[in-house]
Regions:
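Active-site environment of divalent metal-dependent phosphoester hydrolases
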Residues: 15-20, 40-42, 76-82, 127-129, ...
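Beta-strand-turn-beta hairpins that frame and shape the catalytic cleft
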Residues: 1-9, 114-121, 208
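Conserved beta-sheet core of the metallophosphoesterase superfamily
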Residues: 175-236
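MPN/JAMM (Mov34/JAB) isopeptidase/deubiquitinase module and associated MPN-bearing subunits/adaptors
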Residues: 231-251
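Core catalytic region of metal-dependent phosphoesterases/phosphodiesterases
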Residues: 11, 16-102
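Active-site neighborhood of phospho(di)ester-bond hydrolases with catalytic His/Asp-centered motifs
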Residues: 10-12, 32-36, 70-75, 121-122, ...
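Structured catalytic-domain cores with a bias toward divalent-metal coordination
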Residues: 11-14, 109-115
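Active-site-proximal loop/helix segment associated with metal-binding centers of metalloenzymes
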Residues: 94-97, 111, 115-185
Length: 251
């Protein structure tokens, strides 16, 4: 295993779960990227108070480690922040005002996407079809600038048929796994949104790969390590010391 500072821990959709704390405790001193969807729990045993307290803890964790923690917004989050966003199941609509205030107070701590080396992190993923749709405005070689520009809300927030919307191609907050059979060419992606039983990945070419990471509820997460002339991607499970190598990308 490489030095801790060369390791990125990718944490899938939260939905009120505090499992992320155990992952951080297991992997101290790393970089941490949260893929979004902090509220609206699927676990009905979680109270509103627990979910909100968990979001507050995540925000505080970011404030304590500004350079080491990335908080991405998901489709369940943007609906509380932007009027233009498509609405999805608001399991916490009765405390909406409190959630809106939390996000808006610290919105500067949240991002739409992040790029590290040739790896792009977004909530749901970028399809080649969506890129072609948006290509009159986007340069693939400067894609991160485009996807983090709030002026591009219309295409970014697009919700396709697979998730109940009307857009031909979903944007990177809504893209379903079924829409990502052709992910953005020339990049490796790590995304959440589409629930999977474990870390799954789809390889198109050596440099066009997408990892699906929405399996935090199963205690599973992605580890990315850079060492020498390669980047390695591991699947990890809480409660187990050994991680499983999934893919090696040679720089």
């Amino acid at each position: 295993m490489k030095k801790e500072e060369e390791r990125i821990i990718v944490i899938g959709d939260i939905h009120g779960e505090s499992t992320w704390m155990d992952i951080v405790e297991k992997h101290p001193g790393c970089k941490y990227i949260f893929l979004g969807d902090y509220c609206d729990p699927y676990n009905h045993d979680l109270s509103d108070e627990e979910v909100i307290a968990n979001l507050c803890s995540i925000i505080e964790f970011k404030k304590q480690k500004m350079d080491d923690v990335v908080l991405l917004l998901g489709n369940h989050d943007i609906q509380y922040v932007y009027n233009e966003a498509e609405r999805c199941s608001r399991r916490m609509a009765h405390v909406e005002e409190q959630i809106v205030n939390l996000f808006k107070t610290d919105i500067s701590l949240f991002e739409w996407g992040r790029k590290v080396e040739n790896i792009i992190f977004t909530h749901a993923g970028i399809s080649q079809g969506w890129f072609r749709f948006a290509s009159d405005k986007a340069d693939k070689h400067d894609i991160i600038k485009f996807i983090t520009d709030p002026q591009n809300k219309e295409v970014a927030f697009a919700c396709g048929y697979a998730r109940g919307g009307n857009a031909i191609h979903s944007g990177f907050f809504w893209a379903d796994k079924r829409e990502l059979t052709e992910p953005l060419e020339g990049y490796i992606q790590a995304v959440g949104h589409s629930r999977v039983p474990e870390i799954l990945f789809r390889k198109i070419t050596e440099d066009t790969v997408i990892f699906f990471c929405d399996c935090l509820s199963m205690g599973k997460y992605l580890i990315i390590e850079k060492g020498g002339d390669s980047i390695q991607f591991y699947s990890a499970l809480l409660g187990e010391d050994k991680s499983t190598l999934l893919y090696t990308f040679h720089l």
